[in-house]
Amino acid sequence: MSDCSSSGSDEDLDPESELLDELGGKLSKWTNYIHGWQDRWIALKGNILSYYRSADEKEYGCRGSICLSKAVITPHEFDECRFDISVNDSIWYLRAEHPLLRQQWIDTIELHKAESGYGSESSLRRHGSLLSLTSAASGLSTASASSFKKAYSLQEKLAEMETFRDILCRQVDTLQKYFDNCADNESKDELHRDKVSDEEEDFPTLRPDADYLLNNNNSSKEKLFSVNTLKDPAGIDFKGEAITFKATTAGILSTLSHCIDILVKREESWQKRLDKEIERRRRAEDAYKAALTELKKKPHYGGPDYEEGPNSLINEEEFFDAVEAALDKHDQIEEQSQVERSRASRQISLTPDTFSSISTQKYLTKPHSHTSSLSSVDLISASDDVHRFSAQVEEMVHSHMTYSLQDVGGDANWQLVVEEGDMKVYRREVEENGIVLDPLKATHAVKGVTGHEVCHYFWDTAYRNDWETTVESFQVVETLSDQACIIHQTLKRVWPASQRDVLYVSVMRKILSTNENDPDTWLVCNFSVDHDGYPPSTRCIRAKINVAMICQTLISPPEGDKEISRDNIICKITYVANVNPGGWAPASVLRAVAKREYPKFLKRFTSYVEVKTSSEAILF
């Protein structure tokens, strides 16, 4: 039995035991729609897949784990580096650095999944057996008999068969040794017989008398006994070995019969299970078609498959619903913050000096403020505005003054999409390579404000956060001159659309009228440029814009000698926007969102300017 134990210890070092060791590596895991793909340390041990923030943080515990027993591993249809692991409603989206590494991960996970479910073939050899030579010799030993009562598994019976095999091999070797010794003794016996017959022929034939018999009796007996007496070869008990051999073979046949019984019972059991599964599948197939539609209505919207893109699994209607819900949420948050700001402003008490200062300076020209390098109060002309983008600025300004102020009629194919009072919004449908590039034009008339005031609050970044609700953050990258700067602006994420940013030159100009009867024009022009310090990032899609806010102030003379008040002025606004979103999104969704958001923007901004200037001196 020492041989058996030693062989068993060697089996424990089987290479398949390496599956019990922990395997790990770095993969990209989809976290959420805000942070996207993040590098995580993925660990695989047994049938448990865990992930950590990094390999150094393993000692603090895993951030999540799933059991692979019922997991479904699915390679992505389009992304060659991505694969998904789903267990019920839990889905892990993982990406490898290259397709070969992805396939290695999939093969390893599938192997661990199979090993955890059914065990390996070599595991049968690791089962110890309580059978010994003595128990085998008893035919049906106590352990073997009890195995029928306890219904030992097939693996345990196979382990017993291996034990019987080892015992039988040793018994065959013993019997073979016995027969070999018998054959050697037989050949020696024949040799002795030939030698004795030769010796008898050398002596004369005499009648043996008593003395001869007495004198030669002992030596003859020794020769006879030495030739005819057979000792057991090598001290082997042939009868005992035969009985043991018979018992071992009986044990093998008995165990084999039991294995066959187990297989038959399992076959019957599996047949019953198969029949049940066929019936379940028949019923499930009917429910599957109805459930499939319902499941599509409740997708895992946090997954990367439902982001914008030509391969997005979300249809246009659901895409629009998601965008509209996100915009409504943003509006609700903005309204709440506006209420809080207005409440805070009402709590600030105004001193008498403040009222007197407002009343005395109401109709005075506002002096230039040096607190902001982007202030535009003193801006009169752009003749001295020289910088590296001057040529592009002149080209953009000339283009807007030539084409943007033209009437929307004619062959321009402008479509009126929104009309609310004095505000009208027009659109021309343009698509290029499947990307919506619809130019938009809006006209509006606002009483009580001047074109200079509207352009001032639209251009000056000091007021940007007061009226702009779609901006997450912005930064003045470079100040080109007193009336021109470069701005990097990150827009708020509206899921499922990807987050976007813009990098543009913003310039404000006053265009003097060549006709005395026509008013002067104030213009703010924003157009996209490139900057070495702010290249496009993987976090956002870089959009391209060409936007202009063009304002003219119309003054109606006051009655008598009264001074011009805000009741006598009207600002005529023309707003044009050409936006390239930089990525694919459903055309119907973009147009519906533009139809909703542009009028809201104009109303919100002009209302802000009205409130901001109501107590200020008129800025012509």
Swiss-Prot record:
A motif (FFAT) lies at residues 318-324. Pfam families: PH, START. It is found in: Cytoplasm; Golgi apparatus; Endoplasmic reticulum. The lineage of its organism: Eukaryota, Metazoa, Chordata, Craniata, Vertebrata. Keywords: Coiled coil, Cytoplasm, Developmental protein, Endoplasmic reticulum, Golgi apparatus, Lipid transport, Lipid-binding, Myogenesis, Transport. Interacts with VAPA and VAPB. Interaction with VAPB is less efficient than with VAPA. Interacts (via FFAT motif) with the MOSPD2 (via MSP domain). Residues 385-614 form the START domain. Gene3D superfamilies: 3.30.530.20, Pleckstrin-homology domain (PH domain)/Phosphotyrosine-binding domain (PTB). SUPFAM superfamilies: Bet v1-like, PH domain-like. One of its GO terms (biological process) is ER to Golgi ceramide transport. The keyword Translocase does not apply. This is Ceramide transfer protein. PANTHER family: CERAMIDE TRANSFER PROTEIN (PTHR19308:SF53), PHOSPHATIDYLCHOLINE TRANSFER PROTEIN (PTHR19308).
